[in-house]
């Protein structure tokens, strides 16, 4: 802007155009400069307004420029007011949400992810004593106290968890050395020598630009990691050996820092713990899946009860020319003896139980053959007695020489 106290209408238009351009561009981001220019223009204009040329075209351009500046200023003011209002609403909503969250759950300080584990203090101690992760009795008692205190501060999620004891902490360190891979590195890259392992860990931490605890004067002149690995392996170090060591080291550090629980989720441990608890009355029973279902046990069919009724028995050797069904015959000693008289006569003398019977008391030659001559030379054959009761008069009159015989005329 010109320093001349007198101003022309053309210079006035140029001054307004310059202010508009700087206001819209605002590269310098210095509002006081624009304010000073506007104040200077405002002071010069009233004194020289009467001496300005009345050029309608220039005056129209001045009106258009001032209108554009006015619209831009109002737009900037509206945007600024809207931004302030939205920011205030966002702050209020965030504060309200935080108050609601704090009211529904206990306040837990901002902690790292690994601190949510019950073994946080034990992992931290393991990580700080990698060269010799064997805590003393005093350190064990301190870790137990810190772990129990931090567990009690977490809240209701693990209230039912029993407090940690010293022997449990000892077992945890034994398992941690094995599961993390520390024992594997000790065996493979330190010859199972804890002194060599100590120097190897120090060299690794030093090569990784990590803080290492101060160590006394070492008997090893070199502090190079490759030299330690080559010396412990007893041979020149190969790229495969170095890569294997780096992989084992990274796996060990990852397990110590994060553990398994944070990788797979808390629900795995909760599920395992719930499966070991005895179900309480009223609690839903676990559903047996197909994989857990036992195969159905094959049971023998129930045995049918044996009938106590005696089946009728018959002689296995029927008489000659007999056509009767032997299954309907009555089982008697006389019947059996008569049916076998012609073929097994010699067996009567050898059977003690049959010695009391005399089938030939009415004649020794009457039963020499199954057939004999009767009235009118009619042939008579001996048949087995049917099941039934004989008439007593027939036996007394001698019509039937023996109880087991019946006469049939042919």
From Swiss-Prot:
GO CC aspect terms: nucleus
Compartments (UniProt record): Nucleus
InterPro entries: HD, Homeodomain-like_sf, KN_HD, Ustilago_mating
Annotated stretches, region: Disordered: 202-241, 278-335, 375-394
Main localization, broad class: nucleus
Biased composition (Low complexity): 206-222
One GO process term, biological-process aspect: regulation of DNA-templated transcription
Basic residues: bias regions: 294-307, 375-388
Motif Nuclear localization signal mapped to chain: 276-308
Entry coiled-coil feature ranges: none
Region (Highly conserved between B alleles), start-end ranges: 111-410
DNA-binding region, residues: 107-184
Segments for region (Variable domain between B alleles): 1-110
Region (Not essential for B4 function): 333-410
One of the record's GO molecular function terms: DNA binding
Bias (Polar residues) ranges: 312-335
Keyword terms, alphabetized: DNA-binding, Homeobox, Nucleus
Top-level taxon in the UniProt lineage: Eukaryota
Role according to the record: The B locus has at least 25 alleles, and any combination of two different B alleles yields a multimeric regulatory protein, that activates genes responsible for the pathogenicity and for the sexual development of the fungus within the corn plant.
Family: Belongs to the TALE/M-ATYP homeobox family.
Name by which UniProt lists this protein: Mating-type locus allele B4 protein
Species assigned in the record: Mycosarcoma maydis
Phylogenetic lineage: Eukaryota, Fungi, Dikarya, Basidiomycota, Ustilaginomycotina
């Amino acid at each position: 802007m010109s320093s001349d106290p007198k101003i022309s209408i053309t210079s006035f238009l140029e001054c307004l155009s310059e202010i508009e351009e700087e206001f819209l561009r605002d590269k310098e981001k210095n509002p006081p400069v624009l304010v000073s220019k506007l104040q200077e223009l405002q002071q010069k204009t009233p004194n020289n307004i009467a001496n300005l040329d009345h050029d309608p075209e220039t005056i129209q351009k001045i009106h258009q420029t001032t209108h554009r500046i006015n619209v831009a200023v109002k737009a900037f003011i509206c945007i600024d007011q809207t931004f302030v209002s939205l920011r205030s609403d966002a702050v209020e909503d965030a504060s309200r949400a935080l108050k609601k969250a704090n009211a529904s759950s206990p306040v837990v300080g901002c902690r790292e992810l690994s601190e949510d584990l019950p073994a946080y203090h034990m992992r931290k101690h393991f990580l700080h004593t990698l060269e010799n992760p064997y805590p003393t009795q005093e350190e064990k008692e301190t870790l137990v106290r810190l772990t129990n205190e931090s567990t009690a501060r977490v809240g209701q999620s693990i209230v039912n968890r029993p407090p940690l004891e010293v022997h449990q902490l000892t077992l945890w360190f034994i398992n941690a050395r094995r599961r993390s891979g520390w024992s594997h590195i000790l065996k493979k890259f330190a010859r199972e020598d804890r002194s060599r392992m100590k120097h190897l860990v120090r060299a690794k931490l030093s090569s990784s630009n990590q803080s290492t605890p101060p160590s006394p004067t070492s008997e090893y002149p070199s502090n190079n990691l490759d030299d330690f690995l080559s010396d412990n392996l007893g041979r020149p170090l190969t790229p495969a050996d170095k890569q294997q060591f780096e992989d084992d080291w990274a796996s060990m550090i990852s397990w110590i820092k994060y553990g398994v629980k944070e990788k797979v989720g808390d629900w795995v441990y909760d599920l395992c713990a719930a499966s070991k608890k005895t179900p309480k009355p009223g609690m839903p029973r676990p559903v047996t899946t197909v994989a857990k279902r036992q195969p159905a046990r094959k049971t023998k069919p129930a045995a049918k009860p044996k009938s106590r009724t005696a089946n009728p028995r018959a002689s296995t050797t029927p008489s000659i020319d007999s056509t009767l069904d032997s299954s309907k015959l009555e089982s008697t000693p006389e019947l059996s003896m008569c049916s076998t008289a012609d073929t097994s006569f010699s067996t009567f003398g050898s059977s003690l139980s049959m010695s009391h019977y005399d089938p030939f008391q009415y004649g020794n030659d009457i039963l020499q053959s199954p057939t004999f001559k009767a009235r009118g030379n009619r042939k008579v054959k001996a048949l087995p007695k049917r099941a039934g009761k004989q008439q007593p008069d027939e036996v007394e009159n001698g019509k039937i020489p023996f109880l087991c015989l019946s006469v049939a005329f042919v």
